[in-house]
């Protein structure tokens, strides 16, 4: 069996993975993910009609965003998960068709995504090998369809987290279905798909705003916080991913047990929320970005809870200490389900932790963060004054993702080389390339302002829009802000589309441009939006500083 996947930045040779994913997923899992997405497109086509007649069901919304989320890079590697999810998808699809039939609505059965069937698991795998990315023959149409699909995957991840906290917006689900249905439509042109990609950006903004509201309404607005990066002499649980509700439940259930809780990777910004500061056993952050987890999980000694991406296929030496939940999966790893009441029982992982040694100290000290939009706007007068007096000459948005590629040391060197009168605005795990450097401050304003997780790129957009208003500008691109963004997976795609929708131009993406962008589509993005790549620190610095 072979595969073709080019959805992440590490696509093999900058083209695509064809034998095994650089991420570690096998060819059969890659193909099953393709078939799940294909079937979700069919469900979306049908559910749009169901919405029009009022026979749609909320369970379809949840199935859609959970299914999409499970196919994001480094979320789920489990073949059986995808076999079962595809079977559930087909059953749901047929249920929607039956509901439409009862409502007197005819369904166009010519679309294969709506009518394919199976008898055995072997049938599923055979069909999976035929419906992947390369089934769209036109390179440019394929490129745009995948750009939109990956953007919708990112949107689904953010919608999932908002939903977990009780926040949803039917307009977002309607758009996700519309977009997925349209990528099946062979009558659409490249121009149609460019317009749809920008519309995805609009709903990307809406979804990030919804998640921001969900997080801040539930846990308070992030505030300036110093986070411990050392350890204590108690057994611990390391929680990674992005799911704040999982963290909340874990903290509640570990209270008084003698087990400490540490964050890892993208869970670091949880420390910035006021609601989590009441837990004395919420110790700090352990380690760095996701791709270093093989070494860091080994040294942590205690169990690890993966709530979302990014999971790296675990080594045998610590695999028995890895637990997954939500849509995360890996064969042979323990899974903690959600109960009928929406709650999770973490007693097994807590008891496991009690039997483990305390974590090995790998660093010590503190890092500072919590500069989401509400906190930064409280400092607005100070920041505006620093800009007006020339103390701050330029802001650099360096949000995004980190990854394994050695060339990503560029971002560390770039941060070091920035003039002392510049400030970095960041969100996402890209921060780990420079958030432990001693870059100082400007009139008490740290030179690295960390807004939070990748979805908190929304905060950076809010900050930019507010600065535009304060300075009386009619164009966001007239602000002294440059965009040098590191990307890795599909949530970064929806952040990019959101920025393009907001009118931001001259965004530079690295360490490489997406493999899924064809030369012609890349040219459109360059000509229309000024999208660019990166070269080397010295030349890029001159370009950004206008030298």
From Swiss-Prot:
EC number: 1.7.99.1
UniProt binding sites for hybrid [4Fe-2O-2S] cluster: 242, 266, 310, 401, 429, 454, 489, 491
Record-listed [4Fe-4S] cluster binding positions: 5, 8, 17, 23
Name assigned to this protein: Hydroxylamine reductase
Protein role: Catalyzes the reduction of hydroxylamine to form NH(3) and H(2)O.
Keyword flag Translocase: no
Organism in which the protein naturally occurs: Thermoanaerobacter pseudethanolicus (strain ATCC 33223 / 39E) (Clostridium thermohydrosulfuricum)
SUPFAM superfamilies attached to this UniProt entry: Prismane protein-like
Record keyword Cytoplasm present: yes
HAMAP family: Hydroxylam_reduct
Listed InterPro entries: HCP/CODH, Hydroxylam_reduct, Prismane-like_a/b-sand, Prismane-like_sf, Prismane_a-bundle
Required co-factors: [4Fe-4S] cluster; hybrid [4Fe-2O-2S] cluster
GO molecular function, one term: peroxidase activity
